[in-house]
Amino acid sequence: MNTLASFADLTPKFALGPLRVTISTAANERYWRAAGIDHPLLQAGALYPPIAANLTIMLFNQHCGDAVIQTRQRVQCHMRAEADAELEAVGVVVAAYEKRGRAYCDIVAEVSHEGAPLWTSEVSFTPVATFGSSA
């Protein structure tokens, strides 16, 4: 059985992945429609690039079970892929630090299709604050 790391265990160079998923045509269309976008690329069957953000969160959750808040996200698109393509996401913790009394970690994830880079996703997470009982 896999044991998940705690947020505190996520130090620089902590490897994440691989995560392999296939985004179906129906799921891809739901992503586009939920964003309120009717774009020619949707009609052409192209994957919705912000899916990379969701894959980064899924990749993170494979390794850390702590509840977190995503505080920053940046996605860079390198090329286009079609729906129903198998994607692979791998990542690494690039920084772990404290700011304003809260722990943070920064992750860079690469999403690829057939070995070719599709998207680079950069994200920052902080653990959800826990509050003591006032009883």
Name what the model sees in each region:
Residues 2-5, 81-88, 92-135:
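HotDog/MaoC-like acyl-thioester-processing domains
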